[in-house]
């Protein structure tokens, strides 16, 4: 089944397929849509991130933790996470949303991530979804500077995309250059091309997501030689 690939990317196999289907269903497609799951998932996500930040950064003030949490749970971050799972390929949308490109809309992608969190919680328990969320956010947490400004706390891919958008330039293009190793022990090499650089920049990582983030970080470093971003 097509959704099996999604479950592998999420790192969780649903016991109740109906919860997975509901989490992926937009209100434009069915009355059995995902908005109640989204409500639940939003609360769970905020709890998990708040708890994680509290224990990970014991010397950071309440205001600092609030800024970090806001960055991690905001719509753009969730939509970026959804794209890393190729979530748009699995959405159940009505014809109107399909024609208008709803599978790419950040609000729909972000809401679906929250609905999946709610669905996984109902399908399992708080401990399971907490472990999953921490795993999904590991790269972002590891690269987060608690003393940095709100803008610089964004992950490299998000910062690069916003850099290009501010200048009305084409968005970065990522493609796989090479995959080495057996399944579950692979090294991905990703090329990232932007219009302001003549050659693509290469990033490596143990997953496509990590390799893309590393490539984006290197592109940002290259662009910083020309202007302050």
Swiss-Prot record:
Q: Which SMART domains match?
A: DSRM (SM00358), RIBOc (SM00535)
The text of the family note is: Belongs to the ribonuclease III family.
* Entry GO MF terms: double-stranded RNA binding; metal ion binding; ribonuclease III activity; rRNA binding
Active-site residues, record numbering mapped to chain: 42, 114
Q: Tell me its cofactors.
A: Mg(2+)
- Protein name, entry field: Ribonuclease 3
Location of the DRBM domain: 155-225
Give the taxonomic lineage as stored in the record: Bacteria, Pseudomonadati, Pseudomonadota, Gammaproteobacteria, Enterobacterales
According to the record's subunit comment, the protein's assembly and interactions are: Homodimer.
Return the Pfam families for the record: dsrm, Ribonucleas_3_3
Do you know which HAMAP family this protein is assigned to? RNase_III (MF_00104)
EC number(s) recorded for this UniProt protein: 3.1.26.3
Q: Where in the cell is it found?
A: Cytoplasm
Kindly list the biological process annotations in GO that this record carries.
Answer: mRNA processing; regulation of gene expression; rRNA processing; tRNA processing
What keywords is this UniProt entry annotated with? Cytoplasm, Endonuclease, Hydrolase, Magnesium, Metal-binding, mRNA processing, Nuclease, RNA-binding, rRNA processing, rRNA-binding, tRNA processing
Q: Which reaction does it catalyse?
A: Endonucleolytic cleavage to 5'-phosphomonoester
Q: Pinpoint the RNase III domain residues.
A: 3-125
């Amino acid at each position: 089944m097509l959704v099996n690939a999604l479950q592998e990317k999420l790192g969780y196999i649903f016991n109740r397929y109906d919860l997975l289907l509901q989490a992926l269903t937009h209100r434009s497609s069915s009355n059995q849509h995902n908005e109640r799951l989204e409500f639940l998932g939003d609360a769970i996500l905020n709890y998990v991130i708040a708890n994680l930040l509290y224990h990970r950064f014991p010397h950071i003030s309440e205001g600092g933790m609030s800024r970090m949490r806001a960055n991690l749970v905001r719509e753009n971050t969730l939509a970026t996470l959804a794209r890393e799972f190729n979530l748009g390929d699995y959405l159940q949308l009505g014809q109107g949303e399909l024609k208008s490109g709803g599978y790419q809309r950040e609000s729909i992608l972000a809401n679906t991530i929250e609905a999946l969190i709610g669905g996984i919680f109902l399908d399992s328990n708080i401990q399971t979804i907490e472990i999953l969320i921490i795993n999904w956010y590991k790269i972002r947490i590891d690269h987060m500077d608690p003393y940095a400004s709100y803008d610089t706390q964004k992950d490299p891919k998000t910062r690069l995309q916003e850099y290009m958008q501010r200048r009305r330039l084409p968005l970065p293009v990522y493609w796989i250059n090479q995959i080495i190793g057996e399944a579950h022990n692979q090294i991905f090499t990703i090329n990232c091309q932007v219009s302001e650089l003549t050659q693509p920049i290469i990033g490596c990582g143990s997953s496509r997501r990590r390799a893309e983030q590393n490539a984006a970080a290197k592109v940002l470093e290259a662009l910083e030689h020309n202007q302050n971003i």
